[in-house]
């Protein structure tokens, strides 16, 4: 995949990337795409998958849980996966 296509992927929102990835999967499952085109869209699908995973990881890193003291009062926040 060329750099322009990769840049296009990085500009997509999570929802846009998932939607395009679903279209690619459907086209590949139908089997009505020529071999060369199948390889091309498969590679784009891989880039979309990686982009979605990166966006999910970034969102996960931003989520925090509220830490409570013994009386149940908010005491601060900590990463969601602090265990």
Curated annotation (Swiss-Prot):
Localization in the cell: Cytoplasm
Pfam families registered for this protein in UniProt: Exonuc_VII_S
Xref: HAMAP family: Exonuc_7_S
Keyword field: Cytoplasm, Exonuclease, Hydrolase, Nuclease
Key word Ion transport present: no
Gene Ontology cellular component terms for the protein in this record: cytosol; exodeoxyribonuclease VII complex
The gene coding this protein: xseB
Protein name: Exodeoxyribonuclease 7 small subunit
Organism lineage: Bacteria, Pseudomonadati, Pseudomonadota, Alphaproteobacteria, Hyphomicrobiales
Broad class of the protein's primary localization: cytoplasm
